[in-house]
Amino acid sequence: MSFAVARMTKLKADNLVGIGNHDQRKTTNHSNEDIDVSHSHLNYDLVAGRTDNFKTDIEAYINENKASKRAVRKDAVLVNEWIITSDKDFFEQLDEAETRKYFETAKQYFADNYGDENIRYAVVHMDEKTPHMHMGIVPFDDDKKLSAKRIFNREALQRIQEELPQYLKENGFDVQRGNKNKERKNLSVPEYKAMREELKKIETEKQETQAKLADTKKQLDEIKPRDTKKIASKPTLMNKNKVTVDKSDLADLEQRAVTSDAYNFEKIHLEVENHSLRNDLSEAKGRNYELRKENERLQKLVGTLQGIIRNVDEFLHKKLGINLPEKWLERAGLKEPSKKAPESSQERSEGHHEELDGPSL
C-alpha cells in the first residue's frame, strides 16, 4: 500500500514572490533538474482565477477580509503551503482523471476544515518525476483573524496526518499514513544530501536483491515434476495454492517487507523535503530580487536628494556668495572627506557643538 504525504511550510510576504514564480512556472530557467518543461502545459490550478500574483493578490485578499483594521505585521505568516503527494508507483496506477481526483479530494478535506475561500491556490505539477500539489491556505479562523500558530498548531498537524489518509481511503484511494515519528525534523542541505546518498546505496542493494529473487524464481520454475509431487504428497502441503519455505527464509522475507515499507516512506519523505529545499531557494531568489529593486529605488532617491543639495549650494553661492558647509556636502556624497591632522580635544569639542547646531542630512 502507498503512503499519503502532506507536508506544510510557512510563507511570509517576502517568500511569496519566489514561491509564486516556482509554483506558476513564471521563469524559464529552473534550478530544479526534475522539471520537464515539455510537460509544463499539463500543470493546472484547482482554484484557478483566485491568485495570479502570489504576493499582491494574497495580501489584497487578507486586507479585504481580515476583521482587524490594524495593518498586518511584516513578519506575519500569510500562507501555509501544503505539498500533497504520494509515491511514484501509486500515480503510475492512476490515469489522468484519477490523478486529478486524488488532488481534488485532498483539497476538499482542507476546504471542509479550513474554508474553501481561504485556499488561494492549489497548483498541481505534472511536469516533475512524481505528481504533487502545492496548496496555499490563508490561516484565517472563523472570526477572520489571521493566526498560523493557532490554526495549524501541533494538535492540528497531528489531526491532519491521521485524518487525511483516512479521508482519501474512504474516497477510493488505497493509501495509508506514514510512520509516526515525533522526533522527525527537517533536514539541512548536508543532511539531505547524505541521506540521498544512503538511499542510492539502498536502491542498489534493492536491485541486487530483486535480481537474486528473479534468479531464485527461475530455479524454482525449473524444479522437476517428481520433486513437486514429492512435496505435494506431504499432508501439510495438500493446498496447491501454498508453498513452503524455510523458517530462516521466512524471517528474511518478513524483514525485507518491513524494510521495503520503511524505505518507500523515507524515499517519499525525501522527495517532499527536496521540494521544500527548492522552495527555500525560490524564496531566496524572490527576496534577492526585491532587495535589488529596493536598492535601485534608494539609489534613485539618493541621486534626487544630491541634485537638490547641489542646486541649493549653487543658488547660495550665486545669490549670496556663500556655500553650504563642507561637512554637509561630504555627508551627501558630493565631496570627498577632507583629510585633516588629528584635532586637539578642544577642537573636537568645538566641532561637536558646531555639528549639533546645524541640521543633519
Swiss-Prot record:
Keywords: DNA-binding, Plasmid. InterPro entries: Mob_Pre (IPR001668). One of its GO terms (molecular function) is DNA binding. GO terms for biological process: DNA recombination. Residues 331-361 are annotated as: Disordered. DNA binds at residues 44, 114. It comes from the Bacteria. Belongs to the plasmid mobilization pre family. This is Plasmid recombination enzyme. It comes from Lentilactobacillus hilgardii.
